[in-house]
């Protein structure tokens, strides 16, 4: 190798190293950044995937955690803030979305668990009552912040009240990650399986 080739290699390496690392994952045209921030803390994209019903693409979802986890137990136990980011891929009446939420929650929690978080389930249901339709392109975000609670956002704007119990957030996560997930192909995608 001559000096010119070595110099070219060093210049190319320096240019490559200076490029920003935008490792976004694309799910049905929706880009999920590799990192995000919740409550001032950086989170990593644990996984992202597509929610389908029959043959229809309903939404793309991404799960952000403080550190990557591959099992449901680890995800539910991970400390710090968390985020579920959902981008709608079709119009869905909020009544249908709320019904699917309730069915997913009921399928993956016991009656005792639901009774403990019933006030928060009711508040969450009120959120859907405020929005008649989730439209294609809408972004729904569910953030968990320790010592504060769960806050929902629609297109970046807060909707509904803060729901304080972590058991509620974990119950919501189990809609996608529980033993009976709403979409069996979305669960492994959110757990970062390729």
Describe every region a protein language model picked out.
Residues 3-7, 11:
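N-terminal export leaders
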Residues 18-20:
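N-terminal signal peptide c-region/cleavage motif recognized by signal peptidases
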Residues 69-147:
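Mid-length scaffold segments of soluble, non-membrane domains
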